[in-house]
């Protein structure tokens, strides 16, 4: 009788240990898969959002037929030599507003789309890559896009300078997938225009 009770207790203990191992294994696999989904989501989010930002910048510049002279005052000295450059803040601000508005609109439209990743790809196994049921991922804007204008004059050789006007654009995005979500911030520096100029050597 005692030996039977001991045997039952041993079976219960083994079953409990086996169950605990299975639960821990499942939890570890779930965490690993979720982390992999987050990595993949952030990767594709950066590609998708960067493409939207670049297209919005190009579209806005083209729609306005923007040229360097539209954004900058070139100041000349008495000898008609270029002495300095000054950005047209008002026009740049208008351009900046148009670009951000278009980016926000495109991000909102893009949130209706989904990318699909095979579960085998998420597993990280080469054998199962591209196989299995698909996981759907959506990218949702989690706030308004922010930006900062930059005007930079750098040396490009003897008495030669390169003036560059750019925008640092930041978009906060939430990637949503079946097992949860993750947040990421996509940052991109977009050149609005640039020009190499020869400055007066006396300045």
Which residues are covered by each model-predicted region?
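N-terminal Lys/Arg-rich, disordered targeting/topogenic segments
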Residues: 1-6
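Hydrophobic membrane-insertion alpha-helices, especially the h-region
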Residues: 13-30
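Aromatic-capped interface at the extracytoplasmic side
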Residues: 29-39
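Short extracytoplasmic
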Residues: 42, 46-79
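Structured, soluble extracytoplasmic/luminal domains of envelope-associated proteins
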Residues: 85-139
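Short, solvent-exposed beta-strand/turn "edge" segments of beta-rich domains on protein surfaces
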Residues: 92-96, 154-162
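Beta-strand elements of well-folded, non-transmembrane domains
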Residues: 107-111, 165, 169-177, 190-194
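Conserved small/polar residues in nucleotide/adenosyl-binding loops
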Residues: 197-203
């Amino acid at each position: 009788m005692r030996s039977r009770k001991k045997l039952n207790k041993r079976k219960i203990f083994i079953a409990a240990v086996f169950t605990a191992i299975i639960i821990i294994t499942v939890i570890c696999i779930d965490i690993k898969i979720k982390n992999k989904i987050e990595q993949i989501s952030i990767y594709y989010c950066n590609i998708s959002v960067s493409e939207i930002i670049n297209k919005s910048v190009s579209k806005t510049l083209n729609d306005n037929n923007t040229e360097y002279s539209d954004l900058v005052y070139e100041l000349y000295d008495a000898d008609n030599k270029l002495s300095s450059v000054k950005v047209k803040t008002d026009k740049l601000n208008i351009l900046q507003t148009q670009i951000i508005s278009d980016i926000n609109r495109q991000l909102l439209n893009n949130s209706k789309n989904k990318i699909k990743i095979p579960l085998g790809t998420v597993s990280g196994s080469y054998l199962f890559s591209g196989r299995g049921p698909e996981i759907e991922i959506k990218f949702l804007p989690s706030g308004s896009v922010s930006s900062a204008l930059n005007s930079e004059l750098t040396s490009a050789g003897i008495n030669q300078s390169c003036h560059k006007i750019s925008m640092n654009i930041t978009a906060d995005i939430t990637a949503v997938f079946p097992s949860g979500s993750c947040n990421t911030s996509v940052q991109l520096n977009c050149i609005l225009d640039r020009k190499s100029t020869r400055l007066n050597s006396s300045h």
